[in-house]
Amino acid sequence: LTDTQNKIAEYQQKLDSNEQASELIEKELEQTNLLVGKTAVTGEGVIVTLEDNNEKSIVGSDLRTLVNELKLAGAEAISINNERILNMTEIVDVNDFILINENRIVSPYVVKAIGNQTYLSSALSLKVSGFIDSYQKIGKTVKMTKERNVKIDAYNGRKKLMQLNYAKEEE
């Protein structure tokens, strides 16, 4: 009877260990999906709207600068006109329009960023060197609001995540 009880205890311990491993793998998968944009996310953040006007048009470099500023300020997820921005996202000027994730976007450009709204808004609102002040001074139309509930959709583009063909894990 003691041997049987010991076996049952051993099996239960292995089962518990497997459940813990499964939970850990599930959490890591969930985190990875968030990082690569495969799931929609919601949280506090900011919404920045840039619009073309008669004097100045918004160009791809404006959007790239804004995305970089938001990333530096700790944005965890970003989208422009509902195009999820990933590490491999390109923002390209083509004639009179902008391509993001191979999709054409037009003004107004609504940039959503999830992260600490105080950090995000402070980084963009710095006097003299902040994105908003700098762009307004040169005549571009830029507005920002802090939001408690920003929703950013999952990436739904055709592009696959980058496949590593040459970079290998170091042994």
Language-model features: locations:
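Soluble extracytoplasmic domains of inner/organellar membrane proteins
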Residues: 52-142
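Charged, low-complexity, helix/coiled-coil-prone segments
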Residues: 2-17, 65-69, 142-154
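Extracytoplasmic/luminal low-complexity segments enriched in Pro/Gly and acidic/polar residues
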Residues: 121-122, 131-171
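Structural signature of extracellular appendage/secretion-system components
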Residues: 1, 7, 49-52, 159-170
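Phosphate-binding glycine-rich loops and adjacent basic patches that engage nucleotide phosphates
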Residues: 23-34, 82-85, 161, 171
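Short flexible coil/turn linkers enriched for glycine and charged/polar residues
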Residues: 40-42, 104-105, 146
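Juxtamembrane "stalk/linker" segments
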Residues: 1-49
